[in-house]
Amino acid sequence: MSVSTDTILRLDLYNREQVLAAPEPRLVRQASVSFGRPTVHPVRADQFTGLHKLRPDLHRKQFLLVQWPFDLEKLPANRRYESMTVDIEFDNEAVVALDILPPAYDAPGPSDDETVRIDVRGVGRPRLAWDLCPVDPACGLRPRSRVMLVILDLPADVVRLTGTLGAKAVVARRRLGRFDTTTAESQTPAPFELGIDGTFAILPSASSGSPV
């Protein structure tokens, strides 16, 4: 699989922790997700099989396969990922997921097939998500390179897509011989712009996402 692995965005994930003598809980950074540059591949209508070929609106549509690489930050030895969710939401409600595929792998090593439970959400909608959980929580998720895959269904006259990236993780930390879990998430989704020609940019925002 040929996709760019250059880091273009890092989403820092925070939880809120109560501090003694502090009136309000404070934000504590727990982990991060780094995203590479997405690649775009046109999908022809004649490549479809089954019911998709019978759609009466095919002449008014275009379809794109988008590959989007991401990496989990490597955690200290006393911490592990017990789950991770990465989500994409498009601003144009006419841009929807025709199909969402489990993450592929852009680095050598064994696949997640037997060690990770993967759920995908959002077919037919402009908001889609990948949920990753280890089959054995005691092992955690490995911080390896993965690639999100989605086939988008959009109007034929659309040339540029805008939307946001977000992420959430459950992180376990060992304290005094036991693991405590906390949910950490990006504070504000990071806005982006993606052209059907593959051009891509992170847009200015007050987000906690950090362009690299």
Describe the role of every protein-language-model region.
Residues 1-102, 199-212:
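An N-terminally focused, membrane-permeabilizing/fusogenic/translocator signature enriched
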Residues 97, 104-211:
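Membrane pore-forming effector domains from diverse proteins
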